[in-house]
Amino acid sequence: MRDWGKESEYLHSTRRHLWNNDYFEFLVKCVWKIDKPVKIIDFGCGYGYLAQLFLPIIPKGSTYKGIDISEQLIENAKEIFHDNSEMVSFEVADLNDYKPTAEYDVVICQAVLRHLPNSVQILKKMIDTAKDGGLVICTEPSRRLENAGVYIDSTDFYPFENDDYLEQKWIKEIKSGGRDYQIGIKLPIVMERLGLKNIGVRINDYVDYVRSEDKDEISRFLSDHDVDSEFSDSNGFVAARCHVISYGNK
């Protein structure tokens, strides 16, 4: 399994280009309607990125707890939130073994299930962790949507280049019991099968656009989106990461 603790720079960079803050606030206040203090738990929290989004906009008296397998990322999170210890806490734990000691109003994960071979079992655990009526939220990319969402203004760019590779990789991993690259797009159906109610689906709104003169940003873009450096002299770069936001009530 990938050691995300060694990829902190990548995580910080890509997370900065996932959400527009005003859209996340719209989800919290107008879609999920979090208008009273809540207890939030974040499965696979990394360095606490979702806490950075939640804390400025959730009602006073709310709390957030983050769980992650990486000791390095949890230490990073504790450093970031050292002044918010009353509202925020973090714990190192493997999600497969984690046993919550409380029930939560909001149970959330972001870009976690796609990396797990037992994503449905972890989703079941998330549901079990929610209070009756609690909200379960999964923000997950679909690899096919991600691949289709990249455009580079170059005559050498072929948007279908990775399609055959992704198909074979996906089939191989499914047959071997590996991770499901399509879990993001499947989640509303899986949630309903597992008994969640009031299923809703959104998509994140951020589009990563880089102009040809922004050389530092071009390097960042190529790294974030796994694009070959041969395209570094192209005329423009656009990527819509297309994270599917699925949610429902227990």
Give residue ranges: language-model regions.
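Conserved beta-strand/loop positions that form the S-adenosyl-L-methionine
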Residues: F43
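Class I SAM-dependent methyltransferase SAM/SAH-binding core
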Residues: Y47-D97
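Conserved Class I S-adenosyl-L-methionine
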Residues: D180-I185, G200-N249
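A short SAM/SAH-binding and catalytic strip from SAM-dependent methyltransferases
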Residues: V106-V120
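A short acidic, Gly/Pro-enriched loop at the edge of an enzyme's catalytic core
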Residues: K99-V107
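A short glycine-rich, Lys/Arg-flanked "PGG" loop and its adjoining helix->strand segment in the class I
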Residues: V120-D132
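Conserved class I S-adenosyl-L-methionine
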Residues: M1-V38, Y49-L53, I57, L73
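Conserved catalytic/acceptor-binding region of the Class I
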Residues: I137-V210
